[in-house]
Structures are given as C-alpha cells and as structure tokens.
Design a protein with these regions (language model features):
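N-terminal membrane-targeting/pre-transmembrane regions
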Residues: 1-76
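Juxtamembrane/interfacial segments around transmembrane helices
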Residues: 52-62, 106-116, 132-143
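Transmembrane helical hairpin unit
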Residues: 58, 66-82, 89-103, 109
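Short, intrinsically disordered, charge-rich cytosolic tails of integral membrane proteins
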Residues: 177-200
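Conserved beta-hairpin
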Residues: 93-131
Length: 200
C-alpha cells in the first residue's frame, strides 16, 4: 500500500510537470521581434524532455530500492544502506521540477557583438548587464555525481546588484548556446561547488 502511494505521488508529480511544460510560456513571438541582434539563450524541448525521462527513471529506481529494502529488512538488515540511495534517486524528480520552474521564470537574451545580456523575468523587474563590466564572480553549483547520464546543476553569476542563476538545462542546448557559455568559461575563474541536491 505504501509503495502504491509513493508511485501515485511520483505519477502525479510527473503529470504536473508535463502539464506545466506544455502550458507555460512567455509571449515569445513578441519578445523575439523586439530584440533584434539578441540571441535567446534557452533550453531546447528535446533537452528538457530527455532530462525529465531520466529523472522519472531514477525516481522509479528509487521506489524499487525502497520496496527491496522493506521486503528484505526482516531477513537482511544490512539492506538498510539502500534507503539513502533510494531517497537520493527519488529526489531527482523534484530537482527537475525546481530547475524547470527556474528555467521558465526567466528568459536570457545575449548580444554577442556588444556582450550585453537582457534578462526578462516572469516575476520581478527585467534588467540588463554587460558580461565584461558587470560580472563579479561565477560559480557552478552541481550534484555530487552523475547518475545514469544525468547531472543537475546551475551557474550562479554574481552581478553588482543581482544574482543570475542559469540551470544546466540551458547550457546543455548545444551548439546553440555554446558562444554564451564559452565566453563565460574563457573569461572568468569559475568555482565549482558540489551538493547532494543543487536546489536553486
């Protein structure tokens, strides 16, 4: 019964994320027309869908490990070590939701000629900055390990008056966004921090 409930929770979370993915959006046509000379730095649908599938796969593996732990606990208590792994895998689905929500809360526009970046926010004021004048520090916050080809993380860019956070989902849209992220990598000392769950 407990596993049925866990499975239902995962299914509901998955359906809610899929619904958010299909219904959410900026008024992109108008935005694209207004920003001549700027490239939209975004995550592609294939990248998002691939990460969602991997996250669901990891979460289901977590459910299986919990089931194995409970079934074998009375006979082999050493299987308890599987529980932390199981909850870690379950966390991937909620981590995806966190990063996807951040992804859809903002749009990043980049002008490669002027190095100007315009941030369009769903909530809050829009703002601009220059990559070579306004960036004070760059960090990468990422998971402690890659699991089944899945590595969650985000860039944390400290500006003079703002903090810009960009999920790895955006950086994975290659080669479309290579110039933007290559410019950052080549001109700033990026400090990497490892976390169990890199929640934005």
């Amino acid at each position: 019964m407990r596993f049925l409930i866990i499975g239902l929770i995962i299914l509901i979370a998955y359906l809610m994320i899929r619904k958010k993915f299909s219904l959410f959006g900026f008024t992109e046509d108008m935005s694209r027309n207004l920003k001549s000379g700027f490239q939209l730095i975004e995550a592609s649908s294939p990248v998002i869908q691939a990460n969602l599938k991997k996250s669901v796969s990891n979460a289901m593996m977590g459910v299986v490990l919990i089931l194995i732990t409970v079934l074998l606990f009375m006979k082999i208590k050493i299987v308890l070590f599987l529980l932390p792994i199981a909850f870690f895998l379950l966390g991937y689905l909620f981590l995806f939701n966190n990063h996807f929500s951040k992804l859809k809360s903002q749009q990043i526009w980049y002008n490669a000629k002027t190095n100007e970046v315009f941030i369009e926010q769903l909530k809050g004021e829009n703002y601009t900055f220059n990559m070579f004048k306004d960036i004070e520090a760059v960090q990468k916050i990422e998971s402690i390990q890659t699991t089944k080809g899945l590595l969650y993380g985000y860039y944390r860019i400290k500006l003079k008056n703002k903090i810009l956070e960009i999920p790895y989902l955006v950086a994975e849209n290659k080669p479309a966004n290579n110039l933007f992220f290559d410019t950052i990598a080549q001109n700033f000392n990026i400090v990497t921090q490892k976390r169990i769950f890199p929640i934005i």
